[in-house]
Curated annotation (Swiss-Prot):
GO biological process, one term: tetrahydrofolate interconversion
Name the UniProt record assigns to this protein: Formate--tetrahydrofolate ligase 2
Keyword Membrane: no
InterPro entries: Formate_THF_ligase, Formate_THF_ligase_CS, P-loop_NTPase
UniProt pathway annotation: One-carbon metabolism; tetrahydrofolate interconversion
Similarity section: Belongs to the formate--tetrahydrofolate ligase family.
Lineage: Bacteria, Bacillati, Bacillota, Bacilli, Lactobacillales
Residues holding ATP: 63-70
Amino acid sequence: MPTDIEIADAAKMQPITEIAQKLGLSSDDIEQYGHYKAKINLPVKEVEGKKHKLILVTGINPTSAGEGKSTVLVGLGDALNQLGHQTTIAMREPSMGPVFGIKGGATGGGYSQVVPMEDINLHFTGDMHALTSANNTLAALIDNYIMRDNVLGLDPRRIIWKRVEDVNDRVLRNVVTGLGGIMQGVPRETGFDITAASEMMAILCLSESLHNLKKRIGRIVVGYTYEKKPVTVDQLGFTGAITLLLKDAIKPNLVQTLDHTPAIIHGGPFANIAHGCNSVLATQIALKTSDYTVTECGFGADLGAEKFLDIKRPVLGETPNAVVIVATARALKLNGGADKDELTKEDIPALEKGMANLRRHVENMQKYNLPIVVAINHFNSDTEAEIKTIQDACAEMGVKAIEVDAWAKGGQGTQDLAKEVVKLADEELEFHELYKNSDSIEDKLSAIATKIYGAKRVVLSKKAKRQIKTFNEQGWNDLPVCIAKTQYSFTDDQTKLGAPTDFDFHIRDLVPKLGAGFIVALSGTMMTMPGLAKHPAAENMDIDDNGQIAGLF
């Protein structure tokens, strides 16, 4: 079997104008970035007669290598089109942090990929750079404001706006700026986040138009005065300049799968330290122009799916017609106590124990009253006994578990799943909310921790309690909450795998993201700037004298 990059390099792509035509878009509706990439001009008109079905692809708590959720997503989109259901996929764009870190490329794999793969995984159309520039320009303007007149009395000790980079770089988590004398600015402690975890990224992904983007940027709270009053970008007068830097980045990107299914890729927030969903605009365009839209959310359903349903769905104005939960035998064995170096070996006892993790995710999606199917992503090490164990356990839960081989067979290996998705999407179910925005911040945190994670209670640090008091006084208590949590466990401790219950869930810090429209709650030891592993994926990457890339998965 060739590598992902070898398969992608051999692909015969259609001109992007032909892909656009499948969505009813003319050459005037797109801005081409070469022959195979384009940005979609806004606004996009709705195509009459479309079914507008939305399929959400999520997963279980993964191994560090990921479980192929994007691969299944692409295979499902291709399979639906092969079966005659006009489909578009809507995905997040990769961050170079994970690309060069643990997971490598993030455009699917095998024969279920989005192309041009190397472009998408590296710089693509420049959205990540635009977001980084907008974020850091605002940071520079804030520091300059403090150094100059500082009319509002912005306290350097209480600035919460950080600089960002699109890399995993732990040494930048805590830094001191402004050293070197009076002309170098006001010295203060600060730090860097990764671009994918920034509020600027969340704002881009939740904005419904350029006008809405500008309003959201203006609402950003950058810090507090000496009197502890919040200061926004609007108050500083920087809203227009920052919006200007994102005038092209707000336009979703159009590419294609190996099977020429339209793929709209836009925005890339992580689901563990951000809200984990691609842009509202990308999903809206797919829904307006397609019978079926297949989209994804990051990591397991405890993170990405919860945030899609509680944060993105209200802005999008659409509820998923069906949910696909991607599971693998190897991740279930890991959650059942198997050694991480022995996951390719058959281990039915560990698999049976690990099924508690999948069961929790299924039950969580059932709490929202959504139709569910489990996709068992096939790996070569899987045995018939393992697949049967998963399917039998799912049957006891009342859900189908369908084996897919999107990696080796593309859409052809995903057609059984596609047929079940079409069937489920026709069911008429009433969506159940997990909480109401009018609930208190404490109650919203408790709803997620107890109903989704299985916790006994939420334990707030003294700092978090003070912050909630401040947020209540400011009238910010009606915002949804976005919990930053490890992707490996339902708890705030990444070593506690499976499906723990009756544990304390700790919140140490809260950050108001008024531009994005939610409050971030940091649990456990979660960092908003990741670090690199001992052997990052970058070690295996190379390019030869002819520009041929190797090692990009």
